[in-house]
Amino acid sequence: MSTGGVLDVAIVGGGPSGLATAIECQRAGLSYQVIEKGGLVDSIRRFPVNMIFFTTPELLEIGGMPLVCHREKPSRYEALVYYRKVAQRYDLHPRLFTRVAGVERNSDDFTLHLKSEREGIPDPGPVRARNVVLAIGYYENPNRLDVPGAELDKVSYRYVETHPYFGSKVAVIGGGNSAAEAALELFRAGVEVTLIHRGETLSSHLKYWVRPDIENRLARREITGWLGSVVEEIRMDSLTLRDSSGARHEVPNDFVLALLGYRPPYRFLESLGVRSEGADGRPVTDPETFATEVPGLYLAGGVVAGRRTHMVFIENGRFHGEAIVRHICATR
């Protein structure tokens, strides 16, 4: 944690990758501060309430602490409990509900300008650090619909739980795990579900236990499927689809869950001098050290993958901090 003065490392983001980086800083004797705009591991807090991870518990572990769960795979709740215990065990003292509003590059270090996310709480003073690690994830940057009606209150880019939708007609847009799992949960809670996906088939990355379930529900028409179709307009009580033949269909609808994935905060990265390249918009970093082209600036976690968010998970992002800290120590 911070000891005052200029930090060795400022870590922006209090998710698993950020916490793992902080632990590595601690082990290397580097002064550090974790700065998180929300609560601890806020991205996991935002997951659907009943979500089960795709992976086994040991692949979510950081700092050598075991994650104990009651089933083969951990739940969202178990992960939240685990990461709280990690923060306590290592005395990480993250600065929570504090947003990094801007980063200035000085001759020898960085100045981070902070803004409180808590109403009525004054903004803290700036933080200076020789190195900055952006472990910021992408959950604040959902891929949004660009059609008439997308601004209506009935449209959401995040699914939390089934209860508010009971007895309603809900359109779930997307073909990945988030969309498929939301559609299944809603169906089992008494919701009339329509699943819409522009692809002719669902994602090849579906969890192995989700694929047969969603495919069977679609085959039995228990969930109405519109594959190879796109939404053209959203209205208060319906939406218009265009199928692969070009035909248009009006579908009665109460709520829309557009679960279309996420993207990195490109504007923020560009403001710091971080370029992105390729069709997947991957930020330019050294693949071994995760250093950007800006001296002293590193990326960690999901933001490294660009738009290919399925390529970096907690399972591999948790090791980024080790490589980053090794490079910082080698170049001091």
Predicted regions and their residues:
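Short, well-ordered coil/turn residues at beta-beta hairpins
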Residues: A135-I136, I173, L259-L260, A300-V303
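Beta1/beta-strand and adjacent pyrophosphate-binding region of the FAD-binding site
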Residues: T3-S17, S168-I173
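Beta1-alpha1 glycine-rich phosphate/pyrophosphate-binding loop at the start
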Residues: G4-G5, G14-L92, A180-W209, G278-A279
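Conserved hydrophobic helix-helix packing surfaces used for dimerization/oligomerization
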Residues: V9-I11, Y32, V170, V193, ...
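Predominantly flavin-linked oxidoreductase catalytic cores and closely associated redox partners
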Residues: G120-L195, E200-V210
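FAD-site-proximal beta/loop scaffold in flavoenzymes
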Residues: A150-P164, Y262-M311
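A Rossmann-like FAD-binding core segment of flavoenzymes
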Residues: D91, R95-A129, R188-D280, R332
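A conserved FAD-binding loop/helix module that cradles the flavin
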Residues: G301-R332
